[in-house]
């Protein structure tokens, strides 16, 4: 009796909807029957939502919302997005509520294992970083935290970068100064020091023919030749192309242009590496110097 009374009281008191309901019921068409069924379904859902328990109302709400969307599409009205979102949220809640206790426990275990693996990988990475970092391990140093390890790694990387830049600058300055000191065009005053070690071994010219990396054996052995021999060897080797100043050429008048440059350490540039003299210049040598050069070469 209570349900019938609630059903009667839920109907509107105005006669217009009742007449529309009877007119739609009397029609024999399928569309009218479908429309009447949809209208009655709407009234039943509106009457039973307030009287049903929460679980039943949630199920009826989700079912009637889906049915309402279909009816609206048939009648040609626009479907609202709020009803669709409420239906999806209700279905998701229903799925979660329908999960049994073992399934929920399995889901919790999967989530916990994934989180545990992530933290394990992070700890392994931090331990590897602490191993290669200075000041991060020792007998009197306790294990650093993750934030302290990252800050120490950042400072260490910045320090290494600054040290590398400073080392590059120093190396460039050292090699630049070395090249300027040994190059005759950049430093003409240093040619005397280059040519000074040559007369230091007058008695042993042939015993060390291969010590000089660039000069040929004949040119190295001619350091002990007096007077005419030196002038003849000077005629063999042309003057260095970089000796443009006359003062630099007059620094050692007894030696050729090539001997003014070559000293203890040769210049590494390709222009200073003079090739061996050609054979047709040897014919211009004097008769006294040629036998001595041949004996020195042996």
Swiss-Prot record:
<dbReference type="GO" id="GO:0000981">
    <property type="term" value="F:DNA-binding transcription factor activity, RNA polymerase II-specific"/>
</dbReference>
<keyword id="KW-0539">Nucleus</keyword>
<dbReference type="GO" id="GO:0005737">
    <property type="term" value="C:cytoplasm"/>
</dbReference>
<dbReference type="GO" id="GO:0007423">
    <property type="term" value="P:sensory organ development"/>
</dbReference>
<dbReference type="Pfam" id="PF00010">
    <property type="entry name" value="HLH"/>
</dbReference>
<feature type="compositionally biased region" description="Low complexity">
    <location>
        <begin position="79"/>
        <end position="91"/>
    </location>
</feature>
<dbReference type="GO" id="GO:0021530">
    <property type="term" value="P:spinal cord oligodendrocyte cell fate specification"/>
</dbReference>
<dbReference type="InterPro" id="IPR011598">
    <property type="entry name" value="bHLH_dom"/>
</dbReference>
<dbReference type="GO" id="GO:0070888">
    <property type="term" value="F:E-box binding"/>
</dbReference>
<feature type="region of interest" description="Disordered">
    <location>
        <begin position="79"/>
        <end position="102"/>
    </location>
</feature>
<dbReference type="GO" id="GO:0021794">
    <property type="term" value="P:thalamus development"/>
</dbReference>
<feature type="domain" description="bHLH">
    <location>
        <begin position="106"/>
        <end position="160"/>
    </location>
</feature>
<dbReference type="GO" id="GO:0071837">
    <property type="term" value="F:HMG box domain binding"/>
</dbReference>
<keyword id="KW-0805">Transcription regulation</keyword>
<dbReference type="InterPro" id="IPR050359">
    <property type="entry name" value="bHLH_transcription_factors"/>
</dbReference>
<protein>
    <recommendedName>
        <fullName>Oligodendrocyte transcription factor 2</fullName>
    </recommendedName>
</protein>
<dbReference type="GO" id="GO:0042802">
    <property type="term" value="F:identical protein binding"/>
</dbReference>
<dbReference type="GO" id="GO:0045665">
    <property type="term" value="P:negative regulation of neuron differentiation"/>
</dbReference>
<comment type="function">
    <text>Required for oligodendrocyte and motor neuron specification in the spinal cord.</text>
</comment>
<dbReference type="GO" id="GO:0061564">
    <property type="term" value="P:axon development"/>
</dbReference>
<dbReference type="InterPro" id="IPR036638">
    <property type="entry name" value="HLH_DNA-bd_sf"/>
</dbReference>
<dbReference type="InterPro" id="IPR032658">
    <property type="entry name" value="Olig2_bHLH"/>
</dbReference>
<feature type="region of interest" description="Disordered">
    <location>
        <begin position="1"/>
        <end position="60"/>
    </location>
</feature>
<dbReference type="GO" id="GO:0045944">
    <property type="term" value="P:positive regulation of transcription by RNA polymerase II"/>
</dbReference>
<dbReference type="GO" id="GO:0021522">
    <property type="term" value="P:spinal cord motor neuron differentiation"/>
</dbReference>
<feature type="compositionally biased region" description="Gly residues">
    <location>
        <begin position="26"/>
        <end position="41"/>
    </location>
</feature>
<dbReference type="GO" id="GO:0005634">
    <property type="term" value="C:nucleus"/>
</dbReference>
<dbReference type="GO" id="GO:0048714">
    <property type="term" value="P:positive regulation of oligodendrocyte differentiation"/>
</dbReference>
<keyword id="KW-0804">Transcription</keyword>
<dbReference type="GO" id="GO:0048663">
    <property type="term" value="P:neuron fate commitment"/>
</dbReference>
<dbReference type="GO" id="GO:0042552">
    <property type="term" value="P:myelination"/>
</dbReference>
<feature type="compositionally biased region" description="Polar residues">
    <location>
        <begin position="1"/>
        <end position="13"/>
    </location>
</feature>
<keyword id="KW-0238">DNA-binding</keyword>
<dbReference type="GO" id="GO:0046983">
    <property type="term" value="F:protein dimerization activity"/>
</dbReference>
<dbReference type="GO" id="GO:0000122">
    <property type="term" value="P:negative regulation of transcription by RNA polymerase II"/>
</dbReference>
């Amino acid at each position: 009796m209570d349900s019938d009374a609630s059903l009667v009281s839920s109907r509107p008191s105005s006669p217009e909807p009742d007449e529309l309901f009877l007119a739609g019921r009397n029609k024999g068409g399928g569309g009218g029957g479908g429309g009447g069924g949809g209208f009655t379904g709407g009234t039943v859902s509106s009457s039973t939502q307030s009287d049903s328990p929460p679980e039943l109302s949630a199920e009826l709400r989700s079912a009637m919302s889906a049915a309402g969307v279909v009816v609206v599409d048939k009648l040609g009205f626009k479907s609202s997005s709020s009803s669709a979102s409420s239906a999806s949220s209700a279905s998701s809640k229903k799925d979660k509520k329908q999960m049994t206790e073992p399934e929920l426990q399995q889901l919790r275990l999967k989530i916990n294992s994934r989180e545990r693996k992530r933290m394990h990988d992070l700890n392994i990475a931090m331990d590897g970083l602490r191993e290669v970092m200075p000041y991060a391990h020792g007998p009197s140093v306790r294990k650093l935290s993750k934030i302290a390890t990252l800050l120490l790694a950042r400072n260490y990387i910045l320090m290494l970068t600054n040290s590398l830049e400073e080392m590059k600058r120093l190396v460039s300055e050292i090699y630049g100064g070395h090249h300027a000191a040994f190059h005759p065009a950049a430093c003409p005053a240093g040619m005397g020091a280059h040519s000074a070690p040559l007369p230091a071994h007058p008695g042993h010219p042939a015993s060390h023919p291969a010590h000089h990396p660039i000069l040929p054996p004949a040119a190295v052995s001619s350091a002990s030749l007096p007077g005419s021999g030196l002038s003849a060897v000077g005629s063999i080797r042309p003057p260095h192309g970089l000796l443009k100043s006359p003062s630099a050429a007059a620094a050692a008048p007894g030696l050729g242009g090539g001997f003014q440059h070559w000293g203890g350490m040769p210049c590494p540039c390709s222009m200073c590496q003079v090739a061996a003299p050609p054979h047709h210049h040897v014919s211009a040598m004097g008769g006294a110097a040629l036998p001595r050069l041949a004996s020195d070469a042996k």
